[in-house]
């Protein structure tokens, strides 16, 4: 018989809304779903573990997005633990970045495959750094330097229209986003090698990071030529107070290369730990089971472990304060190192494997 880690738990399931074509549910819908769960837990007077098998690439990946700020805030409300996956972008060419010095030029190459209906690029940098930005299409035609001004800027290169938005720092972050939308004049974006050129004008820190959308929204072959594997966590996995879960292959006791990786851009280390995420037997709608792979299926293992800890502590009266960061600390301390790593914790598997799942 197949059963989960905390198989006798009561489930409260929330549908986030209907995804639009080639898109995800809105961030506001996820916030509304979490808010509903938190209010229900408070009304019932019961501890709760929230499992978020959800993530996207939109944001600075520094834990300062609206969603992550909200999650960190609500984590201190009631007796909660929130678990989320690292995403499956670890082996995808969706992230680039580096450091630009004053007077230097950096060229980021982006391959766009044929029949790509649309795509976008986020460029994040420190607001204090001033950089000239140019964009070159596969035919060698170039626009730039772009004007830093409010409102959309519209350009045309070949059969592709570019919409460019310069962001500003916000109440919760110091960073600046330059959002570049590639739209077809007819049916598809011009395929081939695009270039984004950065030139340092007045630079203090110089770090810059770029992301393409994940979630299999792009055609195979579209991506950066020199991608970075570190910094591929999806959002909200970079939130400070969530329990961030990566995936490993339990059959060979090794890290799953698709699992998103943390990076030094965060002031704290992520992920927190890993759980089995390769060839997992899971139920399907209508009855029956099938095997699935991904961090969305690793996360529920840890959510179940958190639920068992909170049952032992809160429900059984052994520790009424066993929730939130305390649950994370217990899971980290008990984690088992995987083979092949000398340094722990690290940006691939965190503190190691969740061991509670081995007890059930």
Regions found by a protein language model. Name each.
Residues 1-2, 12-20, 40-44, 130-132, ...:
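Hydrolase catalytic cores
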Residues 49-50, 67-97, 350-358:
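Catalytic cores of secreted or luminal carbohydrate-active enzymes
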Residues 32-53, 339-360:
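C-terminal domain-closing interface element
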Residues 4, 10-15, 48-52, 81-85, ...:
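Structural recognition of the beta-strand scaffold that forms the well-ordered cores
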Residues 190-194:
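A glycine-anchored, Pro-Gly-centered beta-turn/N-cap motif
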Residues 92-179, 183, 188, 198-199, ...:
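Extracellular S/T/G-rich loop segment that most often corresponds to the catalytic His/Ser-adjacent loop
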Residues 178, 204-215:
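Edge beta-strands of jelly-roll/beta-sandwich modules across compartments, strongly enriched
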Residues 14-16, 34-62, 85-86, 199-201:
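Short acidic, glycine-rich surface-loop motifs adjacent to enzyme active sites
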């Amino acid at each position: 018989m197949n059963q989960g880690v905390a198989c006798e738990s009561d489930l409260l399931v929330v549908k986030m809304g209907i995804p639009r074509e080639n898109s995800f549910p809105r961030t506001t819908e996820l916030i509304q779903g979490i808010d509903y769960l938190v209010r229900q837990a408070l009304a019932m007077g019961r501890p709760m573990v929230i499992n978020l098998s959800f993530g996207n690439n939109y944001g600075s990946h520094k834990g300062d997005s609206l969603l992550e700020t909200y999650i960190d805030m609500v984590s201190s409300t009631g007796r909660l633990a929130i678990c989320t996956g690292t995403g499956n972008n670890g082996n995808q060419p969706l992230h680039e970045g580096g450091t630009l010095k004053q007077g230097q030029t950096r060229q980021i190459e982006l391959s766009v495959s044929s029949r790509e209906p649309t795509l976008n690029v986020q460029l994040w940098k420190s607001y204090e750094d001033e950089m000239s930005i140019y964009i070159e299409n596969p035919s060698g035609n170039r626009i730039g330097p772009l004007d830093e001004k409010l409102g959309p800027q519209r350009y045309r290169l070949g059969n592709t229209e570019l919409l460019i938005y310069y962001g500003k720092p916000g109440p919760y972050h110091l960073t600046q986003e330059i959002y570049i939308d590639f739209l077809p004049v007819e049916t598809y974006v011009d395929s081939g090698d695009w270039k984004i050129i950065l030139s340092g004008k007045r630079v203090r820190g110089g770090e810059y990071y770029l992301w393409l959308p994940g979630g299999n929204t792009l055609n195979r072959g579209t991506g950066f030529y020199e991608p970075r594997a570190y910094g591929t966590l999806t959002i909200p996995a970079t939130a400070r107070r969530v329990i961030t879960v990566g995936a490993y292959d339990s059959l060979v006791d090794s890290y799953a290369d698709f699992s998103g990786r943390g990076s030094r851009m965060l002031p704290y280390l992520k992920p927190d730990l890993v759980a089995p995420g390769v060839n997992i037997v899971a139920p399907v709608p209508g009855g029956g089971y099938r095997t699935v792979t991904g961090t969305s299926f690793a996360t529920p293992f840890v959510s179940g472990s958190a639920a068992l800890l909170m049952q032992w502590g809160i429900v059984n009266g052994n520790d009424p304060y066993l929730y939130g960061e305390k649950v994370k600390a217990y899971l980290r301390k008990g984690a088992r190192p995987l083979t092949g790593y000398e340094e722990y914790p690290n940006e691939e598997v965190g503190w190691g494997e969740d061991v509670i799942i081995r007890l059930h």
